[in-house]
Amino acid sequence: MQHRYICRSIVLVPAVLLALNACQTTDPYTGEQKINSASKGAAIGVAAGAVVGAISGSDAQERRKRAMIGAGIGGLAGAGVGAYMDKQEDDLRKQMQGTGVTVTRQGDNITLNMPGNITFKTGSAELSPQFPNVLDGVAMVLKKYEKTIIEVAGHTDNVGKAEYNQGLSERRAHTVTNYLVGKGIKPERTISIGAGEIHPVASNDTEIGRAANRRVELSLLPLKQ
């Protein structure tokens, strides 16, 4: 049986970030401040979803939601959304310690940033030798928290032709998605996206910046009722 994944070529526009008031706590593993949204789950999730979900778009997420519900995965409601994502975030931070993967939180959405030096060989969609171990840890946590949509986005720097970079980012996102599904993640939960070179997180004028832009991001969005 072949599984179908949503894989889209996209053009991003700048998003307006909303300032949200929430309780902040110090993460025991990194010392950084993070948002604890258990008490404000629904309100924060709606606002942040517009930002974190900008890559795949609401249509793709709605299709995943319907597919997940059809597969018997129930949604979250109210303050339970924030509490659920709090626990998932904590487990991911523990699992990703020492891997080079950063875990960030915005409202009810979690993003894993996987830098290019641990993900893929240069110019290739073949996994680097150390990357499967990282993905195994990610899959272990994601299987525990199945009430989340998983958006896998590949990103590149601007070296070479834009068309090539777009295709490479799509292949890399698809490779990661396939690997996670092979480890037991339900395909109904996944969205595979190639962002190409159009969403940099650093300047492409330096090697350090280009290295930062070569990455895979996993965005985890709660499945809400």
Language model regions located:
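Amphipathic, membrane-active segments
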Residues: 85-117
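Bacterial N-terminal signal peptides that target proteins for export
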Residues: 1-11
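C-terminal motif of bacterial Sec signal peptides marking the signal peptidase cleavage site
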Residues: 18-22
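Stable alpha-helical elements in mature extracytoplasmic
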Residues: 47-48, 88, 92, 131-134, ...
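Second-shell loop/turn segments in exported
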Residues: 78-81, 119-127, 162-165
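Periplasmic peptidoglycan-binding/anchoring modules of Gram-negative envelope and division proteins
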Residues: 95, 120-154, 181, 211-213, ...
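Short, low-complexity, glycine-enriched hydrophobic/amphipathic alpha-helices that associate
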Residues: 26-91
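Periplasmic OmpA-like peptidoglycan-binding domain that tethers envelope proteins to the cell wall
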Residues: 155-225
